[in-house]
Each structure stands twice: as C-alpha cells, then as structure tokens.
Amino acid sequence: QDREARLPVKPDNQGIILWGDSVAQPTTYVLLYLHGFTASRFEGQPIISDFVKEFRVNAYLPRLAAHGLQGTEAMLGMTPANLYNSAKEALVIAHKLGKKVIIMGTSTGCTLALMLGRFSQAGGCPDLIFTEY
C-alpha cells in the first residue's frame, strides 16, 4: 500500500481486498483476480463481487504493474518481466488471505494466471485457475 500511495494512481484503480465476511480474516479459499492489458479490477465485475458473496471467500484484486496510472506515458515502463513480477507478488498476498488460491483472469490476466501455475516460491502454486475469456 505504501508503494501504491507514492504512485499517480487513477481514482479507484488501486488494488483492493474484498472480505468474504464482516471479519477481516483468512478464509479457506481466496480469489485472486488478474485483469487484462490496459484494464483494471472493474473488468471482472460483477462476477467477482457475486463470487465473493456466493461463496463467502476473500478476494484480492491487484493493480498490475504500470496499469491504472495517470498520464499519457503511464504504460511506457511496463515490461513482461515487471508485469509477471506484479502477478507473482499478488499471488503471495493472496496466500495470506486464504488457505487455497483460486485465480480468475481476463485476457492478459489469463496468461499471467497460467504462468503462475508454475510459480512455486513464497506461497506456492494456485489451487485452481479459472479464466473468463
């Protein structure tokens, strides 16, 4: 959150946590939503909110690297490596919010989700990958 606060993030484009219950504590399952290229967390709505309500799971909706920033040159610093690293970081955070991670993605988020299936450090692999498109 400190890093997010130092960046010129567009309003409502920051990463957020949706809690599956009124008590902010880890759940058995957690949903990690990875948005598509040049998109934001809103791309997956209302499916994400409905999923959280229906199954009472936590969800983490990160702002991927170089996305959601103000300015005409916001995406110029994006590379495949920093995009993938931001997805790996999101997976580590998701593992703190629940015991088993379900990844849902759209477009480029789907590609990142599949790549995370091989990620085994600091939190391990996701337990389920679901792609919208």
Model segments located where?
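Short, surface-exposed "cap/lid" segments of acyl-processing enzymes
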Residues: 8-65
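Active-site nucleophile loop of the alpha/beta-hydrolase fold
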Residues: 129-133
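Gly/Ala-rich beta-loop-alpha elbow adjacent to hydrolase catalytic centers
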Residues: 94, 104-113
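Short glycine-enriched nucleophile-adjacent loop
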Residues: 110-122
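Extracytoplasmic/secreted proteins, especially bacterial periplasmic and envelope-associated proteins
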Residues: 43-46, 82-89, 111
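Catalytic nucleophile-loop/oxyanion-hole region of alpha/beta-hydrolase
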Residues: 69-102
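N-terminal targeting or regulatory segments adjacent to alpha/beta-hydrolase or S9 domains
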Residues: 1-3
